[in-house]
């Protein structure tokens, strides 16, 4: 049983039973009891500080709120909820949504038009999510929309725009930047060889450093074995930055499950 970790300022998901139910997803199963209790505390703080606004008739339940908060809390488990202080609202669509956007093609021409988005993280505004993809973020699959958008906010704390370099010690910036760009180039080489669909990781990581940081962070938390094998140096960078070791957690859980098999 997870003990209720505070006595006052109870978050919107009001009961311990609701938190325990919200925790029951594969992504969070490797966390030990101390980490789960800490995660609930951070998630509760996030629910106190942020408003989750359902759009297009979506009915928002307490379990949905709790699970969204837990996913936001995971990357800042050891950093603290204050690291996500750059926004006040989480806008939640039922499914991927259409926005007007501008983009530049390979020839430098700028185009504009409707684009389907899964999520957005505005520099001085809300995070936008969709519930369909949030639900797909519950597994240990390498995909996590909430972590992706939360990481953009962490990235923006280092100067106001997402560059792929979060607030880290000055002495570590050169190595981080070098290794992140090396990972992008390595992934692009793989994409050129086998195509986007057959690539070992989401091709979106090769588009720019900010997206590479966000996408690889998804793997760090939800497919740590793949990231540690594919880009071990980036795994170590992330482990130091987030102050977490998801691979060790997963291996511990796997060992416990193996020990239970007769």
UniProtKB/Swiss-Prot annotation:
Pfam families: Peptidase_M90. It comes from the Bacteria. One of its GO terms (biological process) is proteolysis. Keywords: Aminopeptidase, Cytoplasm, Hydrolase, Metal-binding, Metalloprotease, Protease, Zinc. Its main location: cytoplasm. Binds 1 zinc ion per subunit. GO terms for molecular function: aminopeptidase activity; metallopeptidase activity; zinc ion binding. The keyword Cytoplasm applies. It is found in: Cytoplasm. Its cofactor is Zn(2+). Its EC number is 3.4.11.-. Interacts with Mlc. Belongs to the MtfA family. This is Mlc titration factor A. It comes from Serratia proteamaculans (strain 568).
